[in-house]
Amino acid sequence: MAKVLDLNALDQPILELKLRDDNRTVFRLTVPTVKQYERFISAKSEMSEIAKYQNPEKIKKLFELTAELISCNADYITVTAEELRDKYRLKFGDIVVIFAAYLDFTKEFNNAKN
């Protein structure tokens, strides 16, 4: 007898992120791809250096990576770095907090499946 594993039926782990815009928009973040996860880990290790030296180009790239992170969501909503800064009013400190929470979330997911 054939068995079926339907990945569509599995519940995805979700991290809800509520932003500061007027609508208090909520993004339901999901687990990233392996490539995305590697980029997030790399960026997390650079954050203290970026905060210390305030390099505008690196901060811009960090906002772009955060937009990619937030775009990895259960509702398939894509956001840009510009939207994060302008529409959603994110600051550099918010990025640090989001990354820390997201990495904890992905660690919990990895620990749960092992």
Question: What are the residue ranges of the model-derived segments?
Answer:
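Short acidic, Pro/Gly- and aromatic-enriched capping/linker segments at domain boundaries
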Residues: 2-18
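Short, surface-exposed, charged amphipathic helix/loop patches that serve as local interaction elements
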Residues: 12, 25-114
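Glycine-centered tight beta-turn/hairpin loop motif at sheet-sheet or coil-to-beta transitions
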Residues: 20-24
